[in-house]
UniProtKB/Swiss-Prot annotation:
The modification N6-acetyllysine is found at residues 4, 11, 13. Residues 1-30 are annotated as: Disordered. Keywords: Acetylation, Chromosome, DNA-binding, Nucleosome core, Nucleus. InterPro entries: Histone-fold, Histone_H2A, Histone_H2A/H2B/H3, Histone_H2A_C, Histone_H2A_CS. It comes from Scheffersomyces stipitis (strain ATCC 58785 / CBS 6054 / NBRC 10063 / NRRL Y-11545). Transmembrane segments: none annotated. This is Histone H2A.Z. CDD domains: HFD_H2A. Residues 15-26 have a biased composition (Low complexity). The nucleosome is a histone octamer containing two molecules each of H2A, H2B, H3 and H4 assembled in one H3-H4 heterotetramer and two H2A-H2B heterodimers. The octamer wraps approximately 147 bp of DNA. H2A or its variant H2A.Z forms a heterodimer with H2B. H2A.Z associates with the VPS72/SWC2 subunit of the SWR1 chromatin remodeling complex. Also interacts with RBP1/DNA-directed RNA polymerase II largest subunit. Gene3D superfamilies: Histone, subunit A (1.10.20.10). Residues 1-11 have a biased composition (Basic residues).
Length: 132
């Protein structure tokens, strides 16, 4: 070796090609990983069916939108309670407070607590006693 610089061997990308490569997420303008979602789709697909790249992008966009929606509502719930950290309780309040998300997410959230609710029949009996 003459020592005039690095010798690149093999089939690796040159520095110019490495700079121009962009991820699927960056091309789609998403934050969530499109490549990982596509890999999960391929792994869970029945009978080795083909998975199109647009389907992975679409699913990633839907997941990102739903996550942003839940986090925005949970952040508002945390802000209303004057705390800076989102807890499972805030997630529970956000999801159960929105009718569409409540229908979509039927799961029980660990350490989420319950929504405060008093049956109207119980309130009427208390009010009648106060009036007498």
């Amino acid at each position: 070796m003459s020592g005039k610089g690095k010798v690149h061997g093999g089939k690796g990308k040159s520095s110019e090609a490495a700079k121009s490569s962009t991820s699927h997420s960056a091309r789609a303008g998403l934050q969530f990983p499109v490549g990982r979602i596509k890999r999960y789709l391929k792994r869970t697909a029945q009978n080795k069916i083909r998975v199109g790249s647009k389907s992975a992008i679409y699913l990633t966009a839907v997941l990102e939108y739903l996550t942003a929606e839940v986090l925005e509502l949970a952040g508002n719930a945390a802000k209303d309670l004057k705390v800076k950290r989102i807890t499972p309780r805030h997630l529970q309040l956000a999801i159960r407070g929105d009718e569409e998300l409540d229908n979509l997410i039927k799961a029980t959230i660990a350490y989420g607590g319950v929504l405060p609710h008093i049956n109207k029949a119980l309130l009427l009996k208390v009010e009648k006693k106060k009036q007498k």
